């Protein structure tokens, strides 16, 4: 949308709370996302204010006309703050309570996708069930984001060590078959799947350091796919997003295995909005600058709130 037209449509919005920080393991990333979103909304002429739920009571939110959620991880991406905002009848960005809770749970998300016949790597939940996946595998805390607590295991000894490390972050730990192949991510904005991004890192996988601290990670957009593969990937991502019940905006992570098949990894209902983040990169490929991106995300929330 043209920035001038967007400003006009947002001109009657009152106070907007930009929720960032929180108490999750992703607090530092959330603060960076919040600062960027806050600046973008102010550039559109909006009365945006940063609110950190770790420092202020939820009563602080009374009197705001809308909320832009930039909280990552527990308490912000799992349906908790969404439930608070529903109770306060404040329109908010992104997915609703249930879809946020599902999206934060890698196991539930994969079960939904599997039930819908969508492709996702074989997996089991450590301590609850076992499956013969062989090696290598990747171990993931079920309710953490930003690749926190994740590790690759090439043998039984490494698997044991990875499980111990992951259990420091989560009592539920996912063990997933390792996929050899390139990793992609597809941002979703409303009903639109944005251009895919291919992620290339010298790390074993796209871990926390590769995401937020490394200068050696490469992001390719266009992703180097032919038109048919690009469209197939975008369609799969949009379908996976909808099957999980998500709305507004988000991101779906996908890999391509050695047989050339797409494999869904996870959905992100509140993706990062830092200078390393992928949604702004995909939006830029469509001609949207950062201010327009955050404005469109907020406008979607307001229009749903009115509906």
Swiss-Prot record:
Places the protein is found: Cytoplasm
Cofactor(s) annotated in UniProt: Mg(2+); Mn(2+)
InterPro entries in the record: ATP-grasp (IPR011761), ATP_grasp_subdomain_1 (IPR013815), D-Ala_lig_Van_CS (IPR000291), D_ala_D_ala (IPR005905), Dala_Dala_lig_C (IPR011095), Dala_Dala_lig_N (IPR011127), PreATP-grasp_dom_sf (IPR016185)
Entry binding sites for Mg(2+) 1: 253, 266
Cofactor note: Binds 2 magnesium or manganese ions per subunit.
Transmembrane keyword on record: no
GO cellular component: cytosol
Protein species of origin: Alcanivorax borkumensis (strain ATCC 700651 / DSM 11573 / NCIMB 13689 / SK2)
Single GO biological process annotation from the record: peptidoglycan biosynthetic process
Binding site for ATP: 136-185
Binding site for Mg(2+) 2: 266, 268
Domain of life according to the entry: Bacteria
The protein, known as: D-alanine--D-alanine ligase
Function: Cell wall formation.
The enzyme's E.C. designation: 6.3.2.4
Classification of source organism: Bacteria, Pseudomonadati, Pseudomonadota, Gammaproteobacteria, Oceanospirillales
EC top class, as a word: ligase
